[in-house]
Amino acid sequence: MRKNVLIVLILLIGAATTVLGKGVTIPNDGKTLCTAELQQAIDAIYKKGGGRLTLKAGTYLTGCIQMRSGVELYLEEGATILGSTNPRDYLIRTSSNIADNPDEITGSALIYAQGVENVALRGKGRIDGQGLALALTIDSLHHTGEMPDPNYNYRRMRPSKRPSLFYFHKCKDIEVEQLKLQSSAGWGLVFDLCENLRLSGLRVHNRAYWNNDGIDITDCRHVRISDCWVDAADDGICLKSHHAESCNYDVEVARCDIRSSASAVKFGTASWGGFRNIYVHDIKVEDTFRSAIAIECVDGGITDSILVERIDAKNTGNALFIRLGQRAGERASVLKNVTIRQLKCEVPFGRPDINYDLRGPEVDYFHNIHPAPICGIPGHPIENVLLEDIEIQYPGRATKGMAYMPLWRKGDVPEQIDKYPEFTMFGELPSWGLYLRHIRNITLKNIKLSLADDDFRPMIVDEDIEGFKFF
């Protein structure tokens, strides 16, 4: 039997609400596709001047729905928006100006918004993208030739064009609060060139398929992410910069718990415009394969005025990675004025994500436990770094039989100037705690690096450092 729910349209004016009248009938049996009915309800509210669309308990099977200015979508407890597993139910954006490297952003999503203002998604309900089933359908349709993906990744045998859970492009005054969000086919929540964005109290469980980032903020201004729980098969909370003429500016990430098969909080790797005035604090990290904090500026952008403090990371592959690189040809990056303080991290001997269904890819060489690298490139140093009140416990147990880079050969560590940035990118390193290279002005204050077992390497190795203070 087809179940239905009556939607009431409410106009929000200040603290008051005005009932506009009867809404539309939307199936919520979880089997009947209701994309058209949901879109009709959203559009009707927009045409009335704005208001709230409340979804009662039930399951709403839908393809892509587009948010409109002035509309709040509220999911009551027990309400689930369930993404269709048919890729034909999703919009595909192919505009060449979507980003400097558009292959990484499809613009396709379950919840889509373009150029809207004053939009909110709230409630105690759930949005489920059914990402695994959707991704496998996309993969099958590519191989049958029905929907070929021109950028199909044959090395990893998976499609690149997969819908995100959210995609908001050039939007203003956006709030997303309290919802449970899960199982995207691609990235999770994507906000591109948006302004005045608030994400709070979210539970993001995005482990359905490869490249399942949790939250991606791309060249946005005035962003607040707070009190969120994120479990992602790729980066947890990731700031990206795809637009050379823009940057992420005035972004705060606060009081979040993150578990990741990649890095917990990451800047990059896309870094065309850069990251400025970013504040990350009070973050708990656990069972994370790569870095607790990764700051990467490698595509010619400018990264400036970064403050990271009060980070508590357990069972995490690396505490900190800061990298200035040059993937963008002649255009050099700038990375300066970075403060990391009150960071604690426990690095295990084995894989932090050993019990995950989707695990991060291993490197293809033998190595001992990696130190935390902070590395610029020749002629382009990272500038003005402060590490203060840092505690990192390493497992030790390094052996020369596994891998050996003696101090007298530290000049043989490859620069990897134009390579993909990752804390493992340099191969075996000659230290166990910190590896510092090509830096102008770095201060280490109250640094406590410890070993659970012996390690034959020195704690810190530095090369090409101008202005080194250690106290």
Regions found by a protein language model. Give the residues of each.
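Bacterial Sec-dependent N-terminal signal peptides
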Residues: 1-23
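Extracellular/periplasmic carbohydrate-active domains that bind, remodel
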Residues: 18-471
